[in-house]
Amino acid sequence: MMERVYNFSAGPSILPLPVLEKVQKELVNYNGTGMSIMEMSHRSSYFQSIIDEAGSLLRELMNIPDEYEVLFLQGGASLQFSMIPLNLMNTYKKAGYVLTGSWSKKALQEAEKVGEVQVIASSENEKFTTIPKLDGLLGDEKLDYVHITTNNTIEGTKYVDIPHVDKVPLVADMSPNILSERYDVSKFGLIYAGAQKNLGPAGLTIAIIKRDLIGGADRYCPTMLNYETYSKNNSLYNTLPSFSIYVTKLVLEWLKEQGGVSAIEEQNKMKSSLLYNFLDESKLLTSPVDPAYRSLMNIPFTTPSEELNNEFLQKAKERGLVTLKGHRSVGGMRASIYNAMPVQGVQQLVNYMKEFELENR
């Protein structure tokens, strides 16, 4: 059997090894039930306890106030691009979007199908290598909400400070960096995230939504795209991705054992610093991102040529450092170092980068 590799994929991504080992142990016979979670009714008392525990752990780890609901959904963040305007564009039929990368553009394109969209700020002219300044841009606009993407997976940028939005709900796609650093949930009207980066396996989407934003969908909104459907039914309106929720619960337990979000944030800063410190000194490998807005989770870098990039990737794979190829729209390489990536994985990558540079001076 092949030894486990260090998987730097942007998603689906690395999961904590203790979680995988527990899944392996419980896979065939969960908790003495004589069946697997994958076989179990989503309306059984066993699964009810799993989803309740997952919700409680998320509330505890993110310090989610009581006036917010935690919803377990499907369809990924991409379906949220449609659900959000269908539910929230209900007063002015207009929303504000900040463009900071490919995913925020896709969110905007879906919102344009529902109502009017105003681009409040954009870093597209800078090829999304930075985060635009928002001071004074979010004042008295008549908007139903403002949408941001807190971390840009493809481009490798993140917000250092969350923009202050007065009286307008702030909606955030946190798919890549939820639970990786501390956020004040009360600053947001809605937070959403696909699970397959920092929460668990693909198939699950989490929405954390202020209760007063639920129930405003147009009567033509499809039932399955209405937040109220899930709120009224404890997320159990139809069959959920039960296995993904179970694994996510185990990941949340693991995160709590690590010391919670504040502890993992410090570890994430240390891991990213290992990479950025090397890139800042390197004469061969460079980072295209504005240093003021560098992501802790997704770190793109490149060599001067496509030939060297391919050589780097091939030799990395031979060393058990895999899925480092950058997104096709950016090129080069990208190391995604989510919560579950151990420090030694990043250190091994940096050691290899140093050797590669020495070989190609």
Curated annotation (Swiss-Prot):
L-glutamate binds at residue 43. It catalyses: O-phospho-L-serine + 2-oxoglutarate = 3-phosphooxypyruvate + L-glutamate; 4-(phosphooxy)-L-threonine + 2-oxoglutarate = (R)-3-hydroxy-2-oxo-4-phosphooxybutanoate + L-glutamate. One of its GO terms (biological process) is L-serine biosynthetic process. InterPro entries: Aminotrans_V_dom (IPR000192), Aminotrans_V_PyrdxlP_BS (IPR020578), Pser_aminoTfrase (IPR022278), PyrdxlP-dep_Trfase (IPR015424), PyrdxlP-dep_Trfase_major (IPR015421), PyrdxlP-dep_Trfase_small (IPR015422). The keyword Amino-acid biosynthesis applies. Pyridoxal 5'-phosphate binds at residues 77-78, 103, 153, 173, 196, 238-239. Pathway: Amino-acid biosynthesis; L-serine biosynthesis; L-serine from 3-phospho-D-glycerate: step 2/3. Keywords: Amino-acid biosynthesis, Aminotransferase, Cytoplasm, Pyridoxal phosphate, Serine biosynthesis, Transferase. This is Phosphoserine aminotransferase. It comes from Bacillus anthracis (strain A0248). It comes from the Bacteria. The gene is serC. Its main location: cytoplasm. GO terms for cellular component: cytoplasm.
